[in-house]
Amino acid sequence: MARKLFTSESVTEGHPDKICDQISDAVLDAIFSQDPMARVACETAVTTGLVLVTGEITTNCYVDIPKIVRSTIREIGYDRAKYGFDCDTCAVLTSIDEQSPDIAMGVNKALEAKTGEMSDEEIEAIGAGDQGMMFGFACDETPELMPMPISLAHKLAMRLSQVRKNGTLNYLRPDGKSQVTVEYDGDKPVRVDTVLISTQHGPEVDYDTIKRDVIEHVIKPVIPAELLDSKTKYLVNPTGRFVIGGPQGDSGLTGRKIIVDTYGGYARHGGGAFSGKDPTKVDRSAAYAARYVAKNIVAAGLARKCEVQLAYAIGVARPVSVRVDTFGTGIIPEEKIESLVNKYFDLRPAGIIKTLDLRRPIYKQTAAYGHFGRTDIDLPWERTDKAEELRKEAQSL
């Protein structure tokens, strides 16, 4: 079959955009730990010496946002002025408003409740917080049912952070990126063609040392040996120097790494970001639900590859559309899989929140190294608890 290449990237927790994602989700978690019914849309921007936290938050609790900001930056590793960004000396500005009452009225009471289709007490009473379409994806390329390029890229970025924090490579600094190019034979990944690592470092270390150490301590422990061969290309800091990094090197914004957060470009994306948003925002909760559905379909053996699209209207509880695409790998027709999805998954916002127990402070841990396919943390949308039911029902169709 034809050989082809596919590439995905990831970034470390010290990347400027990821700093912002983590701050936004740290604020969300702090609020949810006191007020699980809060409405939160928290956006962050960082640049040299400055953090701006803004957005719309409606809650009955108080959280110390500057303290949360400094603590998050400290955990990431920007705790010294020589790194170009210091958690203790950077300025923190906040500008927070309440959620618009025009939006709140649609979320508080769904159209179905207003028109008498459902009672206020039923789960329909919560409407979607916005319109839009969200995608979820799963495939059998890895044990966690993720595309191999993004899976390896995340693991490399995570390893880069680990060797920095545990002192193995103590000259590394928090900012960094990874990129993996995988060669496919048809739709099967067969080898890694190129591995790219860019990592911030201290000025005292030479290029050859960095390249040797990164290959030995980051790449080889992560990439399975059977995927590497004599033709695999290793690119480490290809500019030759990466001392200035983090917010000193580039400004950062919440929600600017949506492809890193999801499937590395391997599947479609509806365009909505995740971090800083409470689960009434379907940009986040419905994307999690779509992954949950797709993963259970693949885990059930109904398809080797599955993409689920959900779409919503603001203030309306039920999805306006549900679509399943198995790319020709399904063992039963897609319309039958869609009927199983509608039967076994409650895709109304309140149904998603209830099924996945989303009104909890679980979000900061997702804000770096991907929201999907995580094996290092327990995320409810990664469960495959519906797979057996789907498998049994499919056998009877």
From Swiss-Prot:
Record CDD domains: S-AdoMet_synt (cd18079)
Region (Flexible loop): 99-109
GO CC terms of this entry: cytoplasm
Subcellular locations according to the entry: Cytoplasm
Pathway entry: Amino-acid biosynthesis; S-adenosyl-L-methionine biosynthesis; S-adenosyl-L-methionine from L-methionine: step 1/1
Pfam families for this protein: S-AdoMet_synt_C (PF02773), S-AdoMet_synt_M (PF02772), S-AdoMet_synt_N (PF00438)
Residues noted as binding ATP in the record, renumbered to the chain: H15, D175, G176, K177, R241, F242, D250, R256, K257, A273, K277
Residues the record lists as binding Mg(2+): D17
Cofactor detail note: Binds 2 divalent ions per subunit. Binds 1 potassium ion per subunit.
Binding site for K(+): E43
Sequence positions that bind L-methionine: E56, Q99, D250, K281
Catalytic activity: L-methionine + ATP + H2O = S-adenosyl-L-methionine + phosphate + diphosphate
Entry GO MF terms: ATP binding; magnesium ion binding; methionine adenosyltransferase activity
InterPro entries (alphabetical): ADOMET_SYNTHASE_CS (IPR022631), S-AdoMet_synt_C (IPR022630), S-AdoMet_synt_central (IPR022629), S-AdoMet_synt_N (IPR022628), S-AdoMet_synthetase (IPR002133), S-AdoMet_synthetase_sfam (IPR022636)
Protein name per UniProt: S-adenosylmethionine synthase
Natural source organism: Acetivibrio thermocellus (strain ATCC 27405 / DSM 1237 / JCM 9322 / NBRC 103400 / NCIMB 10682 / NRRL B-4536 / VPI 7372)
Species classification: Bacteria, Bacillati, Bacillota, Clostridia, Eubacteriales
This protein's encoding gene: metK
